[in-house]
Regions:
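Short intrinsically disordered terminal tails
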Residues: 1-2, 114-123
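Structural detector for short beta-strands of small beta-barrel domains
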Residues: 3-12
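Acidic, low-complexity, intrinsically disordered interaction modules
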Residues: 13-104
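Residue-level detector of alpha-helical secondary structure
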Residues: 93-97, 110, 114-117
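Short, surface-exposed acidic
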Residues: 105-109
Length: 123
């Protein structure tokens, strides 16, 4: 299997994709569909999906010199898909709501924080 290394460039929520850039020059770009997780090569000027990346390609997502995800269109041992920020944010919010079922609004959250030890110092 071939391995490529990419870094996260930006999230394009309007077109439901995350845009990545290769670690090494010459730079090339790839997109990951945030709905179904499919990877595509991308045009360099406006980041349009070009071709679907082959299933035998492993994509290493690099951040601060570390591999944070192993992803790709195929199935392989050790696959650890990239989690888009909006998904992470939604999962975090849902986990908080599950833990604190009485919190339904910003005002509820503010009241909850005020009753924590030294909660007044937060505001």
């Amino acid at each position: 299997m071939k391995t490529i290394q990419l870094t996260f460039l930006f999230e394009d929520t309007g077109f439901c994709k995350d845009v990545f850039q290769s670690v090494n020059q010459p730079y090339y770009y790839c997109n990951r569909d945030t709905v179904d997780g499919t990877w595509y090569t991308s045009t360099p000027d406006d980041y349009q999906n070009d071709c679907r990346i082959r299933k035998d390609v492993i994509i290493e997502i690099i951040s601060d010199g570390q591999v944070i995800a192993l992803d790709g269109n195929g199935d392989f041992e050790g696959k650890k898909p990239f989690i888009p920020f909006y998904t992470f944010r939604e999962q975090l919010a849902q986990a908080f709501l599950n833990k604190h079922p009485g919190v339904h609004s910003y005002e509820d959250m503010k009241q909850k924080l005020l009753f924590l030890p030294s909660g007044g110092a937060l505001l």
